[in-house]
């Protein structure tokens, strides 16, 4: 019951966070729609959600696997959208 309550709270926090889009719980990219990947939750790597690929100016992870990736992603960030690359911008990496 405690685990269920934690998951509900996690989903609510993510749903109402600025810029977060939840399209569904997943295990692999193949379970997500076009333009999304199955990324690990920022709170627990055991929970994954279908989230949009990175757009211009959005934060990214330089080692993120291309889409579709058959394994389980460890990052909470998807790769950049088609035509964009993940490059260092100041202290962060951003899609550009």
Curated annotation (Swiss-Prot):
Disulfide bonds: 26-38, 32-50, 37-78, 60-86, 80-95
Pfam families attached to this UniProt entry: Prokineticin
Signal sequence bounds: 1-19
Tissue expression remark: Expressed by the skin glands.
Keyword Lipid metabolism: no
BP term (GO), one: endothelial cell proliferation
Keywords: Disulfide bond, G-protein coupled receptor impairing toxin, Secreted, Signal, Toxin
Source organism superkingdom: Eukaryota
GO MF, one annotated term: toxin activity
Subcellular location: Secreted
A cellular component term, taken from the record's GO annotations: extracellular region
Family membership noted in the UniProt record: Belongs to the AVIT (prokineticin) family.
Record's function text: Potent agonist for both PKR1/PROKR1 and PKR2/PROKR2, and inducer of a potent and long-lasting hyperalgesia. Also potentiates capsaicin-induced TRPV1 current, when tested on DRG neurons. At subnanomolar concentrations, this protein both induces potent chemotaxis of macrophages and stimulates LPS-induced production of the pro-inflammatory cytokines IL-1 and IL-12. In vivo, potently stimulates the contraction of the guinea-pig gastrointestinal (GI) smooth muscle (nanomolar concentration).
Name listed for the protein in its UniProt record: Prokineticin Bm8-c
Gene source species: Bombina maxima
């Amino acid at each position: 019951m405690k685990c269920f309550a934690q998951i509900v709270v996690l989903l609510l926090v993510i749903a109402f966070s600025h810029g977060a889009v939840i399209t569904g719980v997943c295990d692999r990219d193949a379970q997500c729609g076009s333009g999304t990947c199955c990324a690990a939750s920022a709170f627990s790597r055991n929970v994954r959600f279908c989230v949009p690929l990175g757009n211009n100016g959005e934060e990214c992870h330089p080692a993120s696997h291309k889409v579709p990736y058959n394994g389980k992603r460890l990052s909470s960030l998807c790769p950049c959208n088609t035509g964009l690359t993940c490059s260092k911008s100041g202290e962060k990496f951003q899609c550009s």
